């Protein structure tokens, strides 16, 4: 036995159960997430198959309440259940779509949009993970529910769950003098009102229907008997579903047909045992009402078995109109988010990410834009042609100071939203000292980057290893070292003067025009590239504290890293000591704020929130390193740190008040950048500054 419909779906998908009856709204979830398929369909009229395979959604309201779809705002409402066709999909798709009563502010979250529209309500299952994946749905969506303080509260086992439960929620709480709750509507199947009246507890003289359109009388309401013309849409009948992995479903169909033959009719003196489509004999203990719709709808007359080619999948059976209603719930105020990348490998991963997100129905749609350089991406983001990009701390300084871009999401690495810059050497080179780079061969992750430029250049200035004559900082570095690979040091964006000594690119390994470029076209670009440079050509690598561990002991399958051992390398400490690479906490050159996803400062708080929601849902599905479909934080074979850092464990939203580059980078890091600006000329400090003040 499952605790909810969702537990049962999971049990069936794991071959621990076989069959379940679901309305087509929950069937949509069962199909998409748990790969369930239809097997049989409830038939409500054996004399008319066309009408017998459908029912209608209605909204019941008290007589005397001046209501229309728009005045439901801030009102208390009782729903049959989140995700159900009659109590969720049909009415909400129209309130959000053609009627436009509910303002859509968030993507991927009907509940969050509904919270902004309604007052206190009862929406059973709205706190379930299927509708509350991040646990941030607030309690007002359950305050009308009936089993507070128990495990049944606001679930499908709540006394106010289901169609009959929603009617009880409306009637009991309106007529309870001891409660301040005052619901004005119940969203249910049309036939449920007749059951409640027949069972004797629902007075039809007190209630009417709320219509989605204004009637000829000028009113938005109609009598209860007029549900055929005052309803919120026609819904395909409930389904008996099983796992799509079942290759032979005929035994299940035969079993159901056998049940129908023996137990279809009501009990009689000759057959007093059981009725398949009747629930009234099951009285709720200590409650003055009978149960309804147990396993099957009580107004079911028989089951219909569609041809296999029409029901092999949910989508083959359900009519397109209902699927259009489901899609209406997935509306997003941001139709598309454009992500900027700077090399073909990032572009390929971005396109894979876009396809993976689309497969899970995550909104907004993600598109990928390829630009030549990181600076070009910043410029296009500022000008509104793209929306998001990922930058490390040095580039965040440029993005914020020159392009007015803001950080909205940060990477987390297990130790927190930061990492450490370290200097790595081989153990077999004891003559290499942190305090003397003279004639050394250095490998640096990139010009303008925190680990490869800002922090190491500050260190050689602090230890007086260079004299910066004429304020030419880049030239001073070239005179200190014998050879280096500093990707991007020749790029016009970081060195518009063009006066760059060739030895700062002499160790680089990119082919042709790719040599010494500030992206993955240069083999020695980035944190892992700097370490690879050390293993193949250099003597000191300036990189992250995790880089050695990630690329040794067969953790990186690339050919250059296959035979590397972690204990062949050491860290150079600022005080002159050497330590093993695992002692980075006590032997590093400085702490670096985590990489961030940035956007334009003119984006509203709600736009930024929906950008975050895209990534938040994305990491729920693809945030681990074992997903066979797509891995957000893994770059696969051949490249590292594409779009996101490979060492990222999760992404976190930066609070709105802290979404500015100075607050994220902090005073210590900003002082390091200012030190370089104080000693170097414009265009010769390796930190981007626009020509003639124009970015």
Functional labels for PLM-detected ranges:
Residues 1-17, 22-25, 41-54, 64, ...:
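N-terminal hydrophobic or amphipathic helices and topogenic motifs
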Residues 2-5, 21-28, 33-34, 42-43, ...:
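Beta->alpha turn/N-cap motifs
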Residues 7-9, 165-169, 376-378, 529-533:
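Short, hydrophobic alpha-helical packing/hinge segments within bilobed ligand-binding/sensory domains
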Residues 13, 96-100, 171-175, 382, ...:
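Sec-exported extracytoplasmic/periplasmic mature domains
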Residues 13-22, 76, 172-190, 382-391, ...:
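Alpha-to-beta junction loops
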Residues 29-48, 194-229, 398-413, 418, ...:
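Ligand-binding "clamshell"
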Residues 58-60, 239-241, 422-424, 596-598:
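Residues embedded in well-ordered beta-strands
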Residues 83-92, 448-457:
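Secondary-structure junction motif
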